[in-house]
Amino acid sequence: MQPLHTLLALLPLCRSTTALLAFPGAEGFGANAVGGRGGDVYVVTNLEDSGEGSLRDAVSETDRIVVFAVGGVINIEDRLVVSKRVTILGQTAPGDGITVYGNGWSFSNADDAIVRYIRVRMGRGGDSGKDGITIAEGSNMIFDHVSVSWGRDETFSISGTAENITVQDSIIAQGLETHSCGGLMQTDGGVSLFRNLYIDNKTRNPKVKGVNEFTNNVVYNWGGGGGYIAGDSSGQSFGNYFISGPSTSVTAFTRGNENFHGYVENNYYDPDQDGTLNGNELGVSSSNYGGMDIVDTKYDYPAAQYIMTPDEAVSYVTENVGASLVRDGVDSNLIDQVLSYGTDGALISDEDDFGGVGDLDGGETPTDTDGDGIPDDVETQLGTDPNIADSTEIDSSTGYSWLEVWANSLVPEGYASTRKC
């Protein structure tokens, strides 16, 4: 068990605390998602597809905080449909954590979802024409350190009337051919994409329409479409790095038009596939950004607290993104591709072409006498009672429940925690 960080370290850094963050380090449009705070704790106790103690059962009801007493691969046949106000804390799983394999997830209308440190691997056996993760409606959601791969349609898509969504520190990878798309980000309700890795998707890395902020992302080895920009939009892009790979056939930004209004700053493109990170800044001109209408003034969107240089973003992303508390073989191989700087990478049509989902160490189930989701030894450190189910009580010094205090302590706060105000 990792030692608990001090409670002071869990406080949001350098920003107003009038609205509680989903967790320390949450940023962007979805930063204040509530999740299941105030609801019940559900402990996932097995790796079954359904039934009592399963993840499917855990997310089937509203107002729940989901933690894990097991680690490993959960094989699912049908899509997982997540209810409103659910927190999924994958970092609480023992061993190598949790991978959900075999089909995708729907977060449509899953208002206030908080999802952290989990792997969603759809695969060839998933529903044809469906995404790894879909959000078509709903508001106030944040996805942090999530690894999503092998979508049959898109890998991670946000569209329709969805609003106030953040995807941060995550991997969106290897949409399966013949479609092979990173995903749509098409909503006027606001999407923040901060410090993510898009890799081995032929197109839509991502496809943006509407209100969007795209900051410190790395896009690697796209095929015929890097950053798609289309339609009536107001977006901005800061400090991203596009790195061509063996499959890349077009420049970084494509398909823009005069209805796409964008503020751009310090975005880099490395086209030469020579094994060295040596790209250059894309000049601020419409021709470098797919024909978009370049604007001179930043939009007043909820920005990343710190904006890295593109080189810093590559270092951060390769070290930290995805379900990185324990990186599985899939994510490790993807990161190795990025670090080849153009010489390795491929578009795939079947996950078996990349070695499949692999195995995970399930770890040991911790003792939790009162069944409230917090192991007994941690309750002793926190000062709570291991014999009384008190994990949903609020710690007055942070505003989070004791369960959240513990879960937050298991993982780094993110890039902002390493910086000074």
From Swiss-Prot:
The active site is at 204. Residues 1-19 form the signal peptide. It is found in: Secreted. GO terms for molecular function: metal ion binding; pectate lyase activity. Its main location: secreted. Its cofactor is Ca(2+). SUPFAM superfamilies: Pectin lyase-like (SSF51126). Keywords: Calcium, Carbohydrate metabolism, Cell wall biogenesis/degradation, Glycoprotein, Lyase, Metal-binding, Polysaccharide degradation, Secreted, Signal. It catalyses: Eliminative cleavage of (1->4)-alpha-D-galacturonan to give oligosaccharides with 4-deoxy-alpha-D-galact-4-enuronosyl groups at their non-reducing ends. It holds the Pfam family TSP3_bac. GO terms for cellular component: extracellular region. It comes from the Eukaryota. Glycans are attached at residues 164, 201. One of its GO terms (biological process) is cell wall organization. Residues 353-376 are annotated as: Disordered. Ca(2+) binds at residues 270, 272, 274, 276, 281. It is an enzyme of class 4 (lyase). Its EC number is 4.2.2.2. Residues 367-376 have a biased composition (Acidic residues). Residues 257-292 form the EF-hand domain. Binds 1 Ca(2+) ion per subunit. Belongs to the polysaccharide lyase 1 family. Pectinolytic enzyme consist of four classes of enzymes: pectin lyase, polygalacturonase, pectin methylesterase and rhamnogalacturonase. Among pectinolytic enzymes, pectin lyase is the most important in depolymerization of pectin, since it cleaves internal glycosidic bonds of highly methylated pectins. Favors pectate, the anion, over pectin, the methyl ester. This is Probable pectate lyase C. It comes from Emericella nidulans (strain FGSC A4 / ATCC 38163 / CBS 112.46 / NRRL 194 / M139) (Aspergillus nidulans). The gene is plyC.
